[in-house]
Regions:
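Short, low-complexity disordered leader/linker segments with a strong preference
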Residues: 1-50, 113, 117, 438-442
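Beta-alpha junction/loop-to-helix N-cap segments that form part of ligand/metal-binding clefts
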Residues: 48, 63-70, 82-163, 175, ...
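Short, solvent-exposed amphipathic alpha-helices that sit
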Residues: 64-84, 182, 207-226, 349
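Periplasmic-binding protein-like
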Residues: 115-129, 146-156, 198-203, 254-264, ...
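Extracellular/periplasmic periplasmic-binding protein-like sensory domains
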Residues: 169, 271-345, 355-360, 412-441
């Protein structure tokens, strides 16, 4: 056996030589193990990308919060099923945590602080424009204070137009058509009803409800000045248990139709009360196609209740049908039948932006999210960089009994679905913005 020597040292004997060789091997193995563990640790430290949904999960609109949660859970599951999000550090999974705001501003802010402390980089909310406004303000201030812990706000339902106009915020992205866009689509259908001569306006008394009634009056004046507004009323949000007095006033006014942006139980109880008092006019709604409203109206709503959305299950097309059936396979209970294509497009847009940025760092992602263009279920939408307002097609549907080619799917097992009345391309409902975006310096 050849001897191992050290410069300036005496030759080693056989035993010393064996010990030295074993020591060298041990050190090398330890080094390789350390390097491997360090690499794995670095990857582990990246971990999953943290998402936080801040929503009213209790209180009068708890069912709406739970319905949104199912949509986001499904979106996250689909992304993770394909391996997660590709970044410069490899594939990373998404993790969604929910926080109960109880629909209150202070609770929403408390939830935001908890989410940030838990490592959330992306905040999702939508079931209150009032909550959205305070979250936008808080997130902007937080991002200025702590640029190393920035977060982005992705809004799926808060549609007060101001949020992407005079109150626009670089850190906020809205994926639902705002109230004026939705009203534009509804009014294009309403104006064709030449028999309609009087309407009653009713809404929830907060920023969104006020915006809906304000825009309804403006568009009626422009498109159908012959229509009389026989009532214009706001009611407390989420606090009215009995809508019979409101329904009685609507019927007594002689109105032939109601225009409302009401959602959740405030809509379900309203249409139920209207049925009880015998009101036989139409309902032009933003959200009358879900969460109990069709079942509450029953046959009385057939041909009478209209709704506007970015997509409905009975929109024609193989891709649309495939999308809806995939959701129904995941959530097969009638009570769980509440799917919004925009929420899936929102998650796909976020994934696209993270992958293009190469990391989950919110500023880098925001710069890519401004350019997002995604498609699913036969629907395509893109983000407008000027104001962070997503541009997508809209559809108006009218309540009908399930059956035939036009209404193959019902809503929540009610036996009633929505037949497509008119579809609008994205550019047909796009509206100018007054947003003066203040962009971060770096």
């Amino acid at each position: 056996m050849a001897t191992v020597t050290h410069s300036g040292c005496q030759p080693l004997n056989f035993l010393e030589e064996v010990i030295l060789i074993q020591t060298i091997r041990f050190v090398m193995r330890s080094f390789v193990c350390f390097a491997l563990c360090s690499c794995l640790l670095a990857q582990a430290q990246k971990g999953p990308i943290q998402l936080a949904m801040i929503e009213g999960m209790s209180g009068p609109f708890a069912n709406t919060g739970e319905a949104v949660l199912r949509n986001l859970v499904w979106a996250v599951e689909r992304v993770n099923a394909r391996g997660g999000v590709a970044t410069a550090d490899g594939k990373r999974l998404l993790v969604l945590n929910r926080y109960d705001s109880k629909g209150q501003n202070e609770e929403a802010l408390t939830s935001l602080r908890a989410a940030i402390d838990a490592g959330a980089q992306y905040v999702f909310q939508g079931n209150s424009s009032a909550n959205a406004a305070v979250l936008m303000d808080a997130i902007q201030k937080h991002n200025e204070r702590e640029p190393n812990k920035r977060v982005l706000f992705l809004n799926y339902s808060a549609v007060d137009p101001a949020l992407t106009q005079e109150k626009c915020n670089f850190w906020h992205f809205r994926f639902d058509a705002h109230a004026d866009m939705r009203m534009t689509a509804l009014m294009q259908v309403l104006k064709q009803d030449i028999k309609l001569k009087s309407v009653y306006l009713i809404g929830q008394d907060y920023s969104f409800g006020q915006a809906v009634l304000r825009e309804a009056k403006q568009q009626l004046t422009s498109l159908r000045p012959d229509i009389q507004i026989s009532g214009d009323e706001l009611h407390p949000m989420g606090r009215v248990k009995d809508f019979l007095p409101y329904a009685s006033k609507i019927k007594a006014s002689g109105a032939q139709a109601v225009i409302t942006g009401n959602w959740g139980n405030d809509l379900t109880l309203l249409v139920k009360a209207a049925k009880e008092v015998g009101f036989d006019g139409k309902f032009y709604t933003f959200y009358g196609n879900a969460l109990g409203a069709p079942a509450a109206m029953g046959d009385a709503g057939v041909g009478k209740v209209l709704a506007v959305a970015e997509w409905m299950p009975n929109v024609a097309g193989a891709e649309s049908v495939k999308f809806y059936q995939a959701f129904k396979q995941r959530f097969d209970k009638p009570s769980e039948d509440y799917v919004h294509l925009r929420m899936q497009l929102m998650m796909e847009a976020l994934v696209q932006a993270i992958e293009r940025a190469g990391s989950s760092e919110p500023l880098a992602v925001a710069l890519q999210l401004e350019k997002a263009e995604v498609s699913m279920g036969g629907q395509r939408g893109k983000m407008r960089a000027q104001d962070h307002q997503f541009q997508q097609p809209l559809v108006v549907g009218i309540m009908a009994k399930q059956g035939g080619v036009e209404v193959p799917f019902d809503v929540e097992g009610s036996g009633y679905g929505f037949k497509t009345v008119k579809q609008f391309k994205a550019n047909e409902v796009e509206m100018p913005s007054s947003c003066k975006m203040v962009r971060p310096a770096s």
